[in-house]
Amino acid sequence: MEEIQRYLQPDRSQQHNFLYPLIFQEYIYALAHDHGLNRNRSILLENPGYNNKFSFLIVKRLITRMYQQNHFLIFTNDSNKNSFLGCNKSLYSQMISEGFAFIVEIPFSLRLISSLSSFEGKKVFKSHNLRSIHSTFPFLEDNFSHLNYVLDILIPYPVHLEILVQTLRYWVKDASSLHLLRFFLHEYWNLNSLITSKKPGYSFSKKNQRFFFFLYNSYVYECESTFVFLRNQSSHLRSTSFGALLERIYFYGKIERLVEVFAKDFQVTLWLFKDPFMHYVRYQGKSILASKGTFLLMNKWKFYLVNFWQCHFSLCFHTGRIHINQLSNHSRNFMGYLSSVRLNPSMVRSQMLENSFLINNAIKKFDTLVPIIPLIGSLAKANFCTVLGHPISKPVWSDLSDSDIIDRFGRICRNLFHYYSGSSKKKTLYRIKYILRLSCARTLARKHKSTVRTFLKRSGSELLEEFLTSEEQVLSLTFPRASSSLWGVYRSRIWYLDIFCINDLANYQ
């Protein structure tokens, strides 16, 4: 990366942005495949690898072939094997696409590193560990007391391939690199398989994943930039101050000041308080836009976005892909949670001189609940219980050792508690723990050809409690002097940044 930074110094990159010559450098492919000195992952996607087929000999042959006049003959040849190179052409195309994806990421990486270094005092932040899922945590923890409606948006697809090239022109000003990108899109890959998924989330083939995700993230960035533009255009009423004073429980006061606003050639005096105009979050192929506006205003936003995307991306985007829902009476499945907004009532007694009176306040709070029915369905599909939630034994694990059986059940339980640690109500998880605990006991009893009660009396109940309560043990070690408030800490919502790494139940056989 240091050699790349020397090649793309700020003054040179601003004047030329010549990225095309880098595709003929061997170290680019070493960095792209994590076989060089730099073992860092891409900021956009973790490198999937090439099944140990990468070697510098293949890279040298590839670069030699590209220097020839008809070096792209390996792509246009109908046969799977190239007679001149004697190697699978898909491997060469995959190597070139991975190297090209790494090259076009360089301007983004350098710009991100420079911005983060200036912001954090020359301390580079490891942003390759962050995903779009992490932006949902502050969204779910934000204050929704002033929001009324929400737009559930499915990101538009498909997009014309030339639009992708035009989008990258604002970032990569090297014409040769753009021509090479256009060649990749139109000559090698199927034109209808890039971003044409009929599901809310997008999935790509294992080959060329890095390149596909780079194009998709660039496209999503272009879509999301429209929200910034629309927000700036709609915020023509300037506001200067806002204050939240916590006097008692759920008591909030707003400081309002006189603001002078110039609009349509005449001066208007308005009383305003500054409040967030919209809340936006995206995860996979869905995005949510929450606002404090009325239904009529949200409907205007809906048609504005539809018309804007149709004109900007030259695609047919139906209004049915954007749904307007009221926060107070609508629940949605989001990130595996059943999310809804509920009113949290609070009663405060106030006394003035000899008279006392009660004040009833209702605060909007965003709830993230555990979907118990889908979870039981997943456990039933994996043969841990019946469809009604009655625990059963898992015969396919009876041949394993006792420690392996306990470890598998414990890992599933810990993963579920770890993922749903951000739930507002964790009582549902204890029903899942009961199912897994009893299923584990029945599996062990089946293995030893005894009943559950006999097995527990012989081995002791501590054997199951030891691996199923690791979450409480971690909290007790973290807060050793606060055992009395341990239950309150455990009930609070905790968001872990590594929840995207947790495997699904389908991965356990």
Curated annotation (Swiss-Prot):
It comes from the Eukaryota. This is Maturase K. Keywords: Chloroplast, mRNA processing, Plastid, RNA-binding, tRNA processing. It is found in: Plastid, Chloroplast. Transmembrane segments: none annotated. One of its GO terms (molecular function) is RNA binding. InterPro entries: Domain_X, Maturase_MatK, Maturase_MatK_N. Belongs to the intron maturase 2 family. MatK subfamily. One of its GO terms (biological process) is tRNA processing. Usually encoded in the trnK tRNA gene intron. Probably assists in splicing its own and other chloroplast group II introns. GO terms for cellular component: chloroplast. Disulfide bonds: none annotated.
